[in-house]
């Protein structure tokens, strides 16, 4: 347990979460629009319906994730990459401050993986959303992250440049594709 030393921290409704996909999630029988809108539930309080602002937020999130054309489709009929975009759009409805992503590209093919990383990078650089990502993809972490927390036999936290000079980072050769411990 720690203490917040500066500022007031973030409230739970200021953090969007993208969980690692499970078999149960992949077969969820709801329309894309409904799933994206569900990211607004924290804003509704005791109100049973979404308001215009929340509906617009969902439309905007679907546009950012380039899934507007899928709004009426059933989630379980989508490809893995499309499903991840839907879940990321849902997380965007929850917050514009911080996203916590748990293995966001797990199980995706290389082309879709690259597209997802590009979308995530754009959210960070253009929209100013802080992204904390859990990943076993060390190459992507080195390529996209400003800071890296490496937890293995030893722990490292610091900038990308410092990581590459650290004992943990030197075990991973980015130019060769590498392999992390």
Positions of PLM-derived features:
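Conserved ABC ATPase "signature" region
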Residues: 37, 52-70
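Conserved ABC ATPase signature
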Residues: 74-78, 82
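Catalytic Walker B motif of ABC-type/P-loop ATPase nucleotide-binding domains
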Residues: 99-102
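H-loop (His-switch) and adjacent beta-strand-loop-beta switch element
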Residues: 147-160
């Amino acid at each position: 347990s720690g203490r917040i030393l500066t500022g007031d921290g973030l409230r739970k409704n200021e953090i969007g979460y993208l969980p690692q996909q499970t078999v149960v999630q992949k077969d969820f029988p709801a329309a894309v629009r409904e799933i994206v809108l569900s990211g607004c539930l924290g804003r509704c309080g005791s109100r049973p319906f979404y308001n215009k602002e929340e509906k617009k937020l969902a439309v905007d999130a679907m546009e950012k994730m380039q899934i507007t054309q899928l709004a009426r489709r059933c989630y379980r009929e989508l490809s893995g990459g499309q499903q991840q975009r839907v879940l990321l759009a849902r997380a965007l409805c929850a917050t514009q401050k911080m996203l916590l992503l748990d293995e966001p590209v797990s199980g995706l093919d290389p082309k879709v993986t690259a597209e997802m990383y590009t979308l995530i990078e754009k959210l960070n650089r253009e929209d100013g959303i802080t992204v904390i990502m859990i990943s076993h993809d060390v190459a992507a972490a080195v390529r996209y992250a400003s800071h890296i927390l490496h937890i293995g036999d030893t722990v490292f936290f610091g900038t990308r440049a410092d990581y590459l000079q650290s004992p943990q980072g030197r075990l991973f050769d980015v130019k060769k594709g590498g392999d992390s411990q």
